[in-house]
Regions:
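Structural signature of tandem-repeat unit edges
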Residues: 23-31, 48-56, 71-87, 91-103, ...
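Short, aromatic/basic amphipathic alpha-helical patches
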Residues: 63-66, 161-164, 179-190
Length: 225
C-alpha cells in the first residue's frame, strides 16, 4: 500500500500579515560555483523555493546556506555535484578542504558561530539526487525546521555523523526501497515513506472548519498523516 504524507500549512486570517510570499525559481548552472552570479542580491533574498539543474559544487552550497535568507524548499534532484578543492566551500572558517563529487558537503547547511553549530533555520524541505553517494558530517545539523528529506536514490547513501537534523519528520524514498534504508548504518532512527509527498496550503478563516477546507482542496481527511 502506498503511503502518502500530506503537508498542510495553516494560514490563519488573523496572522496573515507579515508572511513571506512564495517565490519559486529554477536555474540551470552551467559552471560549478557560479550560481550566485546568475541573480541579483534582491532576487536571492526573495527566493523561497529553488530548483537547480546543471552542475554545482561546495561554493554553491555555501552561497545557498549564507545568502538565501528565505529559502524553504531546495530541489537539487537533477543537479550534479562536482568536486571542489579550496577554501571557499562550506567548511567553517574557510578551511582548505577537498569536497568529493556527488557528496552533500560537510556543513552544507550549518555553520559554527561562536563555538555553536547553527543550521539554516528557514530550510523546510530538501530533494536529493539519485546520484548522491554521501551525506557528509553536519550537513544539515541544527536545521531545526527541516521536516522533509526526499531522496531519489533506491539504495541508501552513506550517512555520516550528525549529517541530518533531528527535526526531520520523514524520509521519502523510491517505491520498494524503504528496507534498504532502514537497515543501513545511521538510518535506523528515521521514519521512511515510499513515494511522493502530497502538499497543499489551506487558508482557514476564524470561523472556518479544517475538514471543510480539506474537502474543498479535493483531498480526503483520511489521506492526512
Amino acid at each position: 500500500m502506498k503511503i502518502k504524507l500530506l503537508l498542510i500549512s495553516f494560514i490563519l486570517a488573523a496572522n496573515a500579515l507579515g508572511a513571506v510570499a512564495q517565490v519559486s525559481k529554477t536555474y540551470f548552472v552551467s559552471k560549478p560555483g557560479t550560481l550566485i552570479s546568475m541573480m541579483t542580491e534582491d532576487e536571492a533574498n526573495s527566493i523561497t523555493h529553488l530548483t537547480l539543474t546543471g552542475k554545482i559544487n561546495a561554493e554553491d552550497f555555501r552561497h545557498l546556506r549564507d545568502e538565501f535568507p528565505n529559502l524553504k524548499v531546495l530541489d537539487i534532484s537533477n543537479a550534479d555535484i562536482k568536486m571542489y578543492t579550496g577554501k571557499a566551500g562550506t567548511y567553517p572558517n574557510g578551511k582548505l578542504c577537498v569536497y568529493m563529487p556527488n557528496f552533500i558537503p560537510t556543513y552544507a547547511f550549518s555553520n559554527i558561530v561562536d563555538g555553536v553549530t547553527k543550521g539554516k533555520a528557514t530550510l523546510e524541505k530538501i530533494i536529493l539526487s539519485e546520484k548522491i553517494k554521501n551525506i557528509e558530517d553536519a550537513a544539515f545539523k541544527g536545521c531545526e525546521n527541516l521536516k522533509i528529506c526526499q531522496i531519489r536514490k533506491k539504495t541508501a547513501p552513506n550517512l555520516l555523523p550528525e549529517a541530518l537534523a533531528d527535526s526531520i519528520t520523514a524520509i521519502f524514498v523510491p517505491l520498494g526501497s524503504s528496507d534498504e534504508y532502514r537497515y543501513k548504518n545511521r538510518w535506523e532512527k528515521f521514519a521512511f515513506i515510499e513515494g511522493e509527498p502530497v502538499e497543499t496550503t489551506l487558508q482557514v478563516g476564524a470561523m472556518g472548519k479544517l475538514e471543510e477546507e480539506i474537502l474543498k482542496s479535493g483531498l480526503q481527511p483520511r489521506d492526512i498523516n
